[in-house]
């Protein structure tokens, strides 16, 4: 099982598009809200990263799920991949219901103590009230993505990502500007986009995946679930901790003023692109390594990792140069506010 650069890229690109989907939803919200006002742009930073921190709990669990599925796939125990997949679906479905309730009930109490501006606080709560519904679709989506990446069949992820963006952009424009729903409209559009992406993968799994080969029948296996949790709890913790400091950073910036918060949001949105590249290659590496270990081909691990590293630099390097060279264009794309545009050196930093 000697993976070539082309094979690695063909597996990774849909994964990258899939991870980029979640970030592009936040970026699109920021771009549209940047043309509404500083309060909305700043509030989208706080609410977006707050939502993302919760989302990363599911994302972290999906990493462990993907590793287990990939291992079974490499061992050619294909029916076990389906059994493992359903344990992941059960856990993610239960967790997302609890998290949605907590978001609605606890968020106002937590954020009221952290956010000083009443305007920004109200805008953040309005956003989260609608955005939290997106978790009901994004968590099952994560389970589907883990399965497809684990069996190295990832083309459908690109279609799902395109569907999400095709829904998010027009609905953002319609709900924010035409129906004057402001930041609530952005949250509605984002949740609809995640629903669309989920439906794409659901239909693909139902129609195209060999359900007999992969044992895709509803079954509960407590032992598999416990083993899955032992693997996933650490990736859940790591994923949450990797994002939570960003929220604390934005809370600190909010105390400086709405303009500073808006500028920081633009900076984070640009840097998110590089986060996506790193995350996608990490996800692909985890799947390929698990498949190789399952197939008993440990000698291929380091050559594959070296190839992934080279591809990562080849993709990320030019984008860094473009971000540094075209920062003035980036600012103008987000906002037409002269006050924000004069602070362009933050982007250079």
Please tell me what each predicted stretch does.
Residues 165-199, 325-332, 341-342:
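Membrane-interface helix-loop junctions in multi-pass transport and translocation proteins
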Residues 1-12, 190, 199-242:
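Interhelical loop/hinge segments that connect adjacent transmembrane helices in multipass membrane
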Residues 98-129, 318-345:
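Short membrane-interface helical motifs at transmembrane helix boundaries
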Residues 41-104, 138-157, 263-327:
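Small-residue-rich hydrophobic transmembrane alpha-helices
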Residues 62, 66, 131-149, 157-168, ...:
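Short runs within selected transmembrane alpha-helices of multi-pass transporters and secretion channels
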Residues 6-66, 233-255:
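Signature of the first transmembrane helix
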Residues 20, 24-42, 111-118, 174-181, ...:
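Helix-terminus/linker motif at the lipid-water interface of multi-pass membrane proteins
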Residues 12, 19, 45-48, 92, ...:
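Residue-level recognition of transmembrane alpha-helices
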């Amino acid at each position: 099982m000697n993976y070539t650069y082309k094979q690695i890229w063909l597996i990774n690109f849909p994964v990258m598009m899939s991870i980029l989907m979640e970030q592009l939803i936040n970026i699109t919200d920021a771009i549209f809200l940047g043309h509404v006002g500083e309060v909305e742009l700043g509030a989208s930073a706080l609410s977006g990263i707050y939502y993302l921190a919760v989302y990363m709990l599911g994302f972290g669990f999906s990493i462990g799920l993907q590793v287990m599925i990939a291992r079974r796939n490499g061992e050619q125990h294909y029916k076990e991949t389906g059994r493992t997949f359903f344990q992941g679906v059960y856990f993610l479905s239960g967790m997302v219901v609890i998290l949605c309730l907590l978001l609605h009930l606890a968020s106002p109490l937590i954020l009221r103590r952290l956010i000083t501006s009443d305007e920004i606080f109200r805008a953040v709560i309005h956003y989260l009230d609608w955005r939290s519904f997106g978790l009901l679709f994004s968590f099952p989506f994560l389970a589907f993505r883990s399965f497809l990446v684990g069996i190295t069949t990832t083309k459908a992820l690109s279609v799902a990502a395109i569907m999400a963006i095709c829904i998010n952009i027009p609905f953002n424009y319609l709900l924010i500007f035409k129906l004057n729903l402001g930041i609530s409209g952005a949250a509605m559009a984002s949740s609809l986009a995640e629903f669309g992406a989920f439906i794409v993968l659901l239909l693909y799994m139902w129609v195209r995946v060999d359900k007999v080969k992969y044992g895709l029948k509803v079954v509960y296996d407590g032992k598999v679930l416990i083993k899955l949790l032992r693997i996933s709890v650490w990736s859940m913790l790591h994923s949450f901790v990797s994002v939570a400091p960003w929220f604390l950073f934005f809370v600190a910036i909010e105390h400086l003023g709405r303009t500073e918060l808006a500028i920081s949001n633009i900076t984070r949105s640009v840097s998110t692109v590089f986060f996506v590249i790193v995350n996608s290659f990490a996800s692909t590496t985890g799947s390929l390594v698990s498949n190789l270990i399952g197939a008993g081909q440990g000698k291929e691990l380091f050559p594959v990792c070296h190839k992934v590293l080279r591809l990562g630099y080849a993709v990320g390097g030019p984008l860094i140069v473009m971000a540094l060279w075209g920062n003035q264009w980036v600012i103008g794309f987000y906002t037409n506010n002269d006050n924000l545009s004069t602070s362009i050196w933050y982007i250079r930093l």
